[in-house]
Amino acid sequence: MLIALALALQAVRLVLPLPQPVSTFVIGSLVHMMLVLTWRFSGLGTALLLALLLPLTAYLQGQVLLPLLIPVIWAGNVLFVVLLQLFSANHRLALFLPPLAKAVLMGVAAWCVVNIVALPNPALRKTIMFGMSVPQLVTAFIGIWLARQVFLRIRKL
């Protein structure tokens, strides 16, 4: 059920006409929240499955510009979820380290892809590099915070 909800939230951008930057930060935060909640309620294996499905659906929705970026996003999502698991006992590290590590990994890997493909358009290169770094950091951080708020409210029920 959590995987279906995450994929539905990711598809909101197809029906909700938001400007691209707003869509990126809103949908990205919700998707990261769902990665965290899936890990929390269904375990690491299910969260890793979701981590692999999300970039595929994003590509099919036209949100990933190059197919070679799918493994970059896979790697970032997997690292994010695994670090959540490893640092779950330390709330501060779990809040900051997974988003930071994901953003760094994706930024470096996207740089490699962009240079291997040798995109001729500098604006496209910058767009890809930005999208694979700063928004990942911000939306992952917000997603963890949102997931904690949801988790605390569910625990009160």
Please give the residue ranges for each predicted region.
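Loop-helix junctions at membrane interfaces
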Residues: 1-157
